[in-house]
């Protein structure tokens, strides 16, 4: 039907540089290696309706980027084959954003937008007028959640590096 043709045609696109817009982060690996993705990374790729043979752009978030292809799709996840390492271009400037803790989901918005804009490090602090106050137990949980949000935002915008979420300061 026409709807299926349209859905298939817009499965994913390539950028001006020829890179696939399907970007995922994987551990550092070697060329010609097969990597199994499950969980959130697999769900991110499933959203693009991948097919075996589709190109995927991978990175380790630190210093390596990889050109790869989808080998096999199973109900448990996706197997991708790393074809080659791609030269990594470091950012021209290291930008650190210091932001006061905000209430609600506003911190999530700050992390997403600053990641998309290329910020290298995000440090949240508690100011005198902050409504949100965190005890030591909550700080670790929040930092993990913020790192997860930054990773998702970096995958969404196709960024090469992951921003560092600094320790909470007073």
Roles of regions detected by a PLM:
Residues 3-4, 39, 136:
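Residues at structural and domain junctions
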Residues 12-88, 139:
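N-terminal positively charged helical leader segments and presequences
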């Amino acid at each position: 039907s026409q709807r299926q043709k349209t859905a298939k045609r817009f499965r994913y696109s390539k950028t001006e540089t020829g890179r696939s817009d399907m970007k995922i982060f994987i551990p550092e690996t070697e060329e010609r290696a097969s990597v199994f993705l499950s969980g959130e990374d697999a769900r991110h790729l499933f959203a693009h309706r991948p097919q075996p043979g589709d190109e995927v752009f991978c990175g380790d978030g630190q210093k390596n980027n990889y050109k790869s292809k989808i080998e096999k799709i199973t109900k448990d996840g996706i197997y991708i084959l790393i074809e080659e390492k791609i030269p990594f271009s470091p950012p021209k400037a290291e930008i650190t954003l210091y932001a006061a803790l905000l209430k609600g989901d506003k911190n999530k918005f700050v992390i997403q937008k600053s990641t998309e804009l290329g910020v290298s490090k995000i440090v949240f602090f508690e100011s005198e007028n902050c409504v949100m106050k965190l005890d030591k137990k909550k700080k670790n949980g929040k930092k993990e959640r913020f790192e997860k949000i930054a990773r998702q935002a970096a995958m969404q915008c196709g960024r090469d590096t992951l921003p560092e979420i600094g320790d909470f300061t007073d």
